[in-house]
Amino acid sequence: MDFDKKGGKGETEEGRRMSKAGGGRSSHGIRSSGTSSGVLMVGPNFRVGKKIGCGNFGELRLGKNLYTNEYVAIKLEPIKSRAPQLHLEYRFYKQLSATEGVPQVYYFGPCGKYNAMVLELLGPSLEDLFDLCDRTFTLKTVLMIAIQLITRMEYVHTKSLIYRDVKPENFLVGRPGTKRQHAIHIIDFGLAKEYIDPETKKHIPYREHKSLTGTARYMSINTHLGKEQSRRDDLEALGHMFMYFLRGSLPWQGLKADTLKERYQKIGDTKRATPIEVLCENFPEEMATYLRYVRRLDFFEKPDYDYLRKLFTDLFDRSGFVFDYEYDWAGKPLPTPIGTVHTDLPSQPQLRDKTQPHSKNQALNSTNGELNADDPTAGHSNAPITAPAEVEVADETKCCCFFKRRKRKSLQRHK
């Protein structure tokens, strides 16, 4: 898609009245899609470009705001989707907007046969960066990630939401070259859920025999057991991801089974059978302390986020590290949807993760729906294990770094 040509009828009088930054932040779509020049538009401002990712939600496109000349991400979901979730995700983004580490949402509306959500364009995911760093992160990098993500998850929880989709593909750095290129962002709220009832203002009830929701590799033990998720489960899944980064892999990866149901069972059984001390062996005691704490939380209990953050900030300081955002990937070339760029080393130490307004140049990429090479259910293990629905994930480039993926069978995402 040639972005240098004008968008024809896309620049309407109504469009010119829209905010140049957001371009029409409305849940009611203005007449969109094709123009006389054959250019596909979302709303009056956003031109749709090349595909940069796909999944069971639909597909992700690179876009451009014709008024600001800035790139955006456009998430498309078929209007006739059997399990529509994009409008709910848009609502959750609106609830969470205006804080650091959450991409800004610009627009929601129809685009031909699709519903479209326009968001900021971000840089690579932590999974992409993990690959770039030979699949191991140093303690310093993991602690800088962990301190930020505890803060992100705390913020999500303060907005009455639980996330339920922890995996490295859903945490992205800012777009290289922007002010917040070193901040870790949380994306993809398609599986998020309100844990505080909006009418009664009470915590959702404890339930059992629930379908699996999330990614099997990282999900909590209680999720494997079919228990309703709450705040504790998001934090436990983060702990599993932190150990994945430190170890390079987890003991329950690569397990073989005849059916997906059996495989999920094996993963859950192995998690329960792996003592925390063994999982965290040869790593600082704080990693084990974190997991012991979150696994002991009650379903209704509010986690002590300050305690968990302090565990890691104290370890960080004792180790003599400086919170300078000099991650393991600093200085390496980072492929992005708009070309390869080199990350700059931070010019000076910055303050630890503080809530600030977004830089309007930041961005969103979602690898939701992509498959990890050794985990054919990654990103899809939310489907009821008793009724798997197979879909074909087409050969597609990975959203952030354009790594080729082969065709694989995956589970249909369900609400």
Swiss-Prot record:
The residues annotated as the active site are D165
Its Gene Ontology molecular function terms?
Answer: ATP binding; protein serine kinase activity; protein serine/threonine kinase activity
Cite a GO CC annotation.
membrane
Show the Pfam families listed in the entry. Answer: CK1gamma_C, Pkinase
In terms of superkingdom, the source organism counts as Eukaryota
Q: Name one GO biological process term.
A: Wnt signaling pathway
Alphabetized, the UniProt keywords read: ATP-binding, Cytoplasm, Kinase, Nucleotide-binding, Phosphoprotein, Serine/threonine-protein kinase, Transferase, Wnt signaling pathway
**Record has Lipid metabolism as a keyword:** no
Residue ranges of region Phospho-regulated basic and hydrophobic (PRBH) motif? 369-415
- SMART domains in alphabetical order: S_TKc
User: Compositional bias of type Basic and acidic residues: which residue ranges?
Assistant: 1-17
Using the UniProt record, give the first listed, main subcellular location: cytoplasm
Residues in domain Protein kinase?
46-316
Control of this protein's activity is summarized as: Stimulated by estrogen. Repressed by 5-iodotubercidin (DB04604).
Q: Where in the cell is it found?
A: Cytoplasm, Cell cortex; Cytoplasm
Function statement: Serine/threonine-protein kinase. Casein kinases are operationally defined by their preferential utilization of acidic proteins such as caseins as substrates. It can phosphorylate a large number of proteins. Participates in Wnt signaling. Phosphorylates COL4A3BP/CERT, MTA1 and SMAD3. SMAD3 phosphorylation promotes its ligand-dependent ubiquitination and subsequent proteasome degradation, thus inhibiting SMAD3-mediated TGF-beta responses.
What does UniProt say about this protein's domains? The phospho-regulated basic and hydrophobic (PRBH) motif is sufficient and important for interaction with phospholipids permitting cortical localization. Phosphorylation of the PRBH motif by aPKC inhibits the association of the protein with the cortical membrane.
**Subunit structure, per the record?**
Monomer. Interacts with MTA1 (short isoform) in the cytoplasm. Interacts with SMAD3. Interacts with DUOXA2.
Q: What does the similarity note say?
A: Belongs to the protein kinase superfamily. CK1 Ser/Thr protein kinase family. Casein kinase I subfamily.
Q: What is this protein called?
A: Casein kinase I isoform gamma-2
Organism listed in the record: Homo sapiens (Human)
| UniProt lineage | Eukaryota, Metazoa, Chordata, Craniata, Vertebrata
